[in-house]
C-alpha cells in the first residue's frame, strides 16, 4: 500500500521511562524534540506522530486503537489485561539495561517472613490485580488497596505490607523496607494494536522500528575496533581478542598485511588495545556502535 498520507501513531511513556526511551529512540535513528509541558513531541519522521502518556495507561489505549504502537511494561499489560500484540522485548529501564521487579515488602522490624503471614492483613500497591492474583495463587486472603504513589511510606501505619516496583532496591532500603518475595519481573515491551498489526504498511513500519530499537539495545556497551597487522601476527592477535563475533579479516594492498575489524565489550578496551599493540597490530581505531543488528 502506498505510504502517502499514512501516519503511525506512537505512544511514548511519560514519567520515569521518558528520558531513557527518548535516548533509545535517538540511538535507533528516531530523533524526538520534547518541549517543556508539551505532550506532543516532534520527530524527524513524517510518517510518525507521537504522544506522551503514562505507561500505566498505554496498553489500554493501544488496545482501543488510540495508538497503533506504544511502549509499556509487561507489568502494565498484565495489570490491565490488555489484548495487544507484543512485538518485541526491550530490556531497558530508567537507570539500567535490566528488568525491574515487583516485590512484596514489609518494614524491617515486621514479623512477616512469607506471604502466608499476611492472612487478613492490609497491602497497598499500584498493581492491585497482579497482587490479588499472587495472593490467590498462594491461598492468602488479604485486603489489597490501590496506592496513588509514595507507597514506600505507608508501612506500618497505613499498610502492613506493600507491593512495589524496584530496580536497584535503594529506595526500599532508604525507607527501611525488607523484601519478602518477588512477585513479577517486568521489562519494557513494544506493543501494537491488533488491527494496526494486520495493516501491511503499519506492520512493516512497526517491524522496522522494532528491529532498530533492538539493534540499539544490542549495541549498548559495545564498540568496534579496526586495525592493521602483519599476517605473521594474526594468530597471536586472534588469541587476544575476546570477540563477540568472529573478526572480519581483509586483505590489504601490501601482501603481507591484513586489516582486522571486530566488535568487543567497551569494558575490555583499555586493557585490550595495549595488548593488541604489543602483539603487532598497528593503526588501531576504536569507534562507537549505535546499532548492532543480528
Curated annotation (Swiss-Prot):
Q: Which CDD domains match?
A: PBP2_HisGL3 (cd13593)
- Which reaction(s) does its UniProt entry say it catalyses? 1-(5-phospho-beta-D-ribosyl)-ATP + diphosphate = 5-phospho-alpha-D-ribose 1-diphosphate + ATP
Entry cofactors: Mg(2+)
* InterPro entries assigned to the protein according to its UniProt record, in alphabetical order: ATP-PRT_HisG_long, ATP_PRibTrfase_cat, ATP_PRibTrfase_HisG, HisG_C, N-reg_PII-like_a/b, N-reg_PII/ATP_PRibTrfase_C
- Offer one example of a GO biological process linked to this entry: L-histidine biosynthetic process
Return the similarity comment.
Belongs to the ATP phosphoribosyltransferase family. Long subfamily.
**Localisation:** Cytoplasm
Q: State what protein this is by name.
A: ATP phosphoribosyltransferase
Give the enzyme class.
Answer: transferase
| Task performed by this protein | Catalyzes the condensation of ATP and 5-phosphoribose 1-diphosphate to form N'-(5'-phosphoribosyl)-ATP (PR-ATP). Has a crucial role in the pathway because the rate of histidine biosynthesis seems to be controlled primarily by regulation of HisG enzymatic activity.
Q: Name one Pfam family in it.
A: HisG_C
A cellular component term, taken from the record's GO annotations: cytoplasm
Pathway(s) where this gene product acts: Amino-acid biosynthesis; L-histidine biosynthesis; L-histidine from 5-phospho-alpha-D-ribose 1-diphosphate: step 1/9
Which gene produces this protein? hisG
Gene Ontology molecular function: ATP binding; ATP phosphoribosyltransferase activity; magnesium ion binding
**What EC numbers are recorded for this enzyme?**
2.4.2.17
Please indicate which superkingdom the organism of origin belongs to: Bacteria
> Tell me, what controls this protein's activity?
Feedback inhibited by histidine.
Q: Which UniProt keywords apply?
A: Amino-acid biosynthesis, ATP-binding, Cytoplasm, Glycosyltransferase, Histidine biosynthesis, Magnesium, Metal-binding, Nucleotide-binding, Transferase
Amino acid at each position: 500500500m502506498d505510504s502517502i498520507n499514512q501516519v503511525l501513531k506512537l505512544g511514548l511513556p511519560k514519567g520515569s521511562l521518558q528520558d531513557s526511551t527518548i535516548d533509545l529512540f535517538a540511538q535507533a535513528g528516531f530523533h524526538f524534540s520534547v518541549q517543556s509541558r508539551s505532550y506532543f513531541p516532534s520527530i524527524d519522521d513524517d510518517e510518525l506522530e507521537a504522544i506522551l502518556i503514562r505507561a500505566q495507561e498505554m496498553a489500554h489505549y493501544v488496545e482501543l486503537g488510540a495508538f497503533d504502537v506504544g511502549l509499556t511494561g509487561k507489568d502494565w499489560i498484565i495489570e490491565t489485561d490488555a489484548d495487544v500484540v507484543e512485538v518485541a522485548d526491550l530490556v531497558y529501564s530508567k537507570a539500567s539495561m535490566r528488568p525491574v521487579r515487583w516485590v512484596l515488602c514489609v518494614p524491617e522490624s515486621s514479623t512477616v517472613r512469607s506471604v502466608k503471614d499476611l492472612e487478613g492483613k492490609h497491602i497497598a500497591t499500584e498493581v492491585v490485580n497482579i497482587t490479588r492474583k499472587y495472593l490467590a495463587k498462594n491461598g492468602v486472603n488479604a485486603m489489597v488497596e490501590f496506592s496513588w504513589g509514595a507507597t514506600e511510606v505507608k508501612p506500618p501505619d497505613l499498610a502492613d505490607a506493600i507491593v512495589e516496583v524496584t530496580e536497584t532496591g535503594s529506595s526500599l532500603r532508604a525507607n527501611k523496607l525488607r523484601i519478602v518475595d518477588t512477585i513479577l519481573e517486568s521489562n519494557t515491551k513494544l506493543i501494537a494494536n491488533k488491527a494496526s498489526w494486520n495493516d501491511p504498511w503499519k506492520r512493516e513500519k512497526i517491524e522496522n522500528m522494532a528491529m532498530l530499537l533492538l539493534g540499539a539495545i544490542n549495541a549498548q556497551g559495545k564498540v568496534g575496533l579496526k586495525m592493521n597487522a602483519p599476517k605473521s601476527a594474526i594468530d597471536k592477535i586472534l588469541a587476544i581478542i575476546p570477540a563477540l563475533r568472529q573478526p572480519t579479516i581483509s586483505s590489504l594492498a601490501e601482501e603481507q598485511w591484513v586489516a582486522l575489524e571486530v566488535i568487543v565489550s567497551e569494558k575490555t578496551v583499555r586493557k585490550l588495545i595495549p595488548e593488541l599493540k604489543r602483539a603487532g597490530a598497528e593503526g588501531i581505531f576504536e569507534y562507537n556502535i549505535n546499532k548492532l543488528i543480528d
